[in-house]
Regions:
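Conserved beta-strand scaffold positions in the cores of enzyme catalytic domains, especially
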Residues: 4, 85, 200-203
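P-loop NTP-binding site
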Residues: 199, 218, 234-263
């Protein structure tokens, strides 16, 4: 059986869907059979980031409603034969499915793939509850901004309330700017991890090539010699249990201010 990993954030706009696409592509490139699932019903974007928007015929809601079989809805990646996408419905809303239905679906996918990555919609309402149903573990994506860290803290509280169902959660800190960290103008990695009491899965530096790759529908993790791409490849290796060193980014100065916000 495979592993189901929900990728969540709480706050929108932190790069959660980009993270899902890049980790999925990296895992597939490293030889794993991977399915990425877009749970943002009504606002799907994962197909665009993967360059598969013109190949979508059926979607997740069609599978749950019995309109098609799950294999009919899966869209194979054009370059990576072991990577598949299960797209969200674009013309429905989050009430079209419930947590029990999603749990049954991801259980079926676990039997078909080594890894199932569920791209969770922003927020803590029904879309979040549906997305974590059946997940084995969670990845919380956060940026070094106070609002993002506070929202992630809320999400982690909800994940910890389901610790009997989830094995673990780990953090991916996205859009780090080393120069600002070292100049004490951006929250530092240790401070974020201490506030969120989470294990660090990876650090992704801010990289303008992410925008370019998104517009081209080509995950950056497939591109050699790009710092963010290498970061995603390292995250994929850590997910598989490899001991890969983290980037060395230092910086001090924010924690006293932050403790007042989170206390």
């Amino acid at each position: 059986m495979g592993r189901v990993i929900v990728i969540t954030s709480g706050k929108g706009g932190v790069g959660k869907t980009t993270t899902t696409a890049n980790i999925g592509a990296a895992l597939a490139k490293q030889g794993k059979n991977v399915c990425v699932v877009d749970m943002d019903i009504g606002l799907r974007n994962l197909d665009i980031l993967m360059g598969l928007e013109n190949r979508v015929v059926y979607n997740l809601v069609d599978v749950i409603e019995g309109t098609c079989k799950v294999k009919q809805a899966l869209v194979k990646d054009k370059k990576l034969p072991t990577l598949s996408l299960l797209p969200a419905a674009q013309t429905r809303d989050k009430t079209a499915v419930n947590a029990d239905q999603v749990k049954e679906l991801v259980t079926d996918l676990k039997a078909m793939f080594d890894f199932v990555l569920v791209d969770c919609p922003a927020g803590i309402e029904s879309g979040f509850q549906n997305s974590i149903a059946g997940a084995d573990e969670a990845v919380v994506v956060v940026t070094p901004e106070m609002s993002s860290v506070r929202d992630a803290d809320r999400i982690i509280g909800l994940l910890e309330a389901r610790k009997n169902e989830l094995d673990s959660y780990r953090l991916v800190i996205n859009r780090i700017k080393p120069d600002l960290v070292n100049a004490n103008q951006m929250m530092n990695i240790d401070d974020i991890c201490e506030i969120l009491s989470g294990e660090l899965l990876g650090i992704v530096p801010d990289d303008e090539d992410v925008v370019v790759s998104t517009n081209k529908g080509e995950p950056l993790s497939l591109t050699a010699n790009k710092s963010a791409g290498q970061a995603y490849r390292n995250i994929a290796k850590r997910i598989q249990g490899e001991d890969v060193p983290l980037m060395d980014i230092k910086g001090k100065g924010f924690f006293g201010k932050l403790k007042a916000i989170f206390s």
